[in-house]
Amino acid sequence: MSNIVWHQHAVSKQSRSELKGQKPLVIWFTGLSGAGKSTLAGALEQALAVEGKHTYLLDGDNVRHGLCGDLGFDDAARQENIRRVGEVAKLMVDAGLIVLTAFISPFRAERELVRNLLGADEFVEVFVDAPLAVCEERDPKGLYKKARAGEIRNFTGIDSAYEAPKQPEIHLLNAGKPVAALVDELLTALRQGNYL
């Protein structure tokens, strides 16, 4: 790796940020499958688009169709999945974007890795907190049913651990509130934290 150097661009991250009129950052949604991460990230992206913000949503399922299509779901593969996503998110932040990510990202260490990669001022952890029973009841993809039947191994919340964030920047309880109300909570918290 000693022959590889980082190429400095003539247009800086700050210049890109100023051109877009926004502060680039990553809004990292984490929580169990079925907690509402993708739904909330998508709704927040729509709200930010209405405000003229330049965004991109990296969704766990979509990323596994390409960038991380070669990975499985054991602990090592999950960690590599999040490492890759973190690197892509960092490049997008450098481009001046507000990046929303929706990944179970079950391990604190992998989320901290991404936080450290970006820096504390460019990483907002959003814990979408829904009880396991609620997630199983929702089960939009039928994955909990398959995991309970033994058809899926290493499924977070069933036979693989989820390590809830200890101090997320934003903690959303999602056990029945309308999506619009949760997006309002998100926007308020992001503004109060000077992230937007």
Curated annotation (Swiss-Prot):
Coiled-coil features, chain-numbered ranges: none
Record key words, sorted: ATP-binding, Kinase, Nucleotide-binding, Phosphoprotein, Transferase
An individual GO BP term: sulfate assimilation
Assigned EC number: 2.7.1.25
Keyword Cytoplasm carried by entry: no
Pathway: Sulfur metabolism; hydrogen sulfide biosynthesis; sulfite from sulfate: step 2/3
InterPro entries: APS_kinase (IPR002891), P-loop_NTPase (IPR027417)
Catalytic activity: adenosine 5'-phosphosulfate + ATP = 3'-phosphoadenylyl sulfate + ADP + H(+)
Gene3D superfamilies reported for this sequence: P-loop containing nucleotide triphosphate hydrolases
SUPFAM superfamilies to which the protein is assigned, alphabetical: P-loop containing nucleoside triphosphate hydrolases
Active site per UniProt: 105 (phosphoserine intermediate)
Protein residues bound to ATP: 31-38
Gene Ontology MF, one: ATP binding
Role this protein plays: Catalyzes the synthesis of activated sulfate.
PANTHER family named in the record: ADENYLYL-SULFATE KINASE 1, CHLOROPLASTIC, BIFUNCTIONAL 3'-PHOSPHOADENOSINE 5'-PHOSPHOSULFATE SYNTHASE
Family: Belongs to the APS kinase family.
Protein name: Adenylyl-sulfate kinase
Underlying gene: cysC
